[in-house]
A protein has these predicted regions:
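Substrate-binding strand-loop-helix patch
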Residues: 20-22, 48-56, 76-94, 144
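NAD(P)-dependent short-chain dehydrogenase/reductase
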Residues: 1-50, 57
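A hydrophobic C-terminal alpha-helical subdomain
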Residues: 108-130, 135
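Amphipathic terminal alpha-helices
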Residues: 138-153
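Mid/C-terminal beta-alpha module of Rossmann-like enzyme folds, strongest
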Residues: 61, 68-114, 118, 153
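Amphipathic alpha-helical segments that line or abut small-molecule/effector binding pockets
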Residues: 56-64, 139, 143
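A general structural signal for well-ordered alpha-helical segments in protein cores
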Residues: 25-32, 55, 59, 84-88, ...
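Short aromatic/basic micro-patch
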Residues: 10, 52, 81, 104, ...
Length: 153
């Protein structure tokens, strides 16, 4: 891209979570929330780390990107590096759901899913330094989800 364009920006958000439209595919937070709410067991991997991004943080970052117009690759991710099992425990805690339903497994439990490296986190230095957006911790993002749920109830 840099060979054909004089100026470019690639915006790379990582795995996002937050309330989504009912007609769309669930994200990790909504999927875990729904399963635990129904009292169903959830198997979550503990051997792949990512830094999940609250969807409102993504919007905030995109807005800053449009205003400041940096060039190059901008990663957009959350503050905390967690695996899906740890993320599930956060969901259970914040929403007051039964964490004992969450089962720790490794990626080999899901052979149909593409192999991933153990660390899939994205670096957020440019997000912080050039856009002025601070990555949101998982607990804070989930509490914002819970507050939004109460606001619409």
């Amino acid at each position: 891209m840099s060979e054909t364009l004089e100026r470019f920006t690639i915006f790379r958000p990582i795995l996002m979570y937050g309330w989504n439209h009912a007609a769309t595919r669930p994200n990790p937070a909504t999927w875990i929330y729904e399963k635990l709410l129904r009292g169903e067991a959830v198997e979550l991997v503990d051997d792949v780390t990512e830094n999940p991004l609250y969807n409102h943080s993504c919007g905030e970052t995109l807005w800053a990107l449009l205003k400041r117009q940096p060039e190059g690759i901008i990663h957009c991710a959350g503050h905390d590096a967690v695996n899906r099992y740890e993320f599930g425990l956060f969901v259970a805690k914040v929403f007051g759901l039964d964490a004992s339903l969450i089962k720790r497994v490794d990626s080999s439990r899901f052979p149909g899913i593409a192999a991933r490296p153990p660390n899939t986190t994205l670096a957020t230095q440019r997000m912080r330094r050039e856009l002025g957006v601070q990555p949101l911790p998982v607990g804070k993002g989930l509490r914002a989800m819970k507050a939004a749920m109460r606001a619409t109830a």
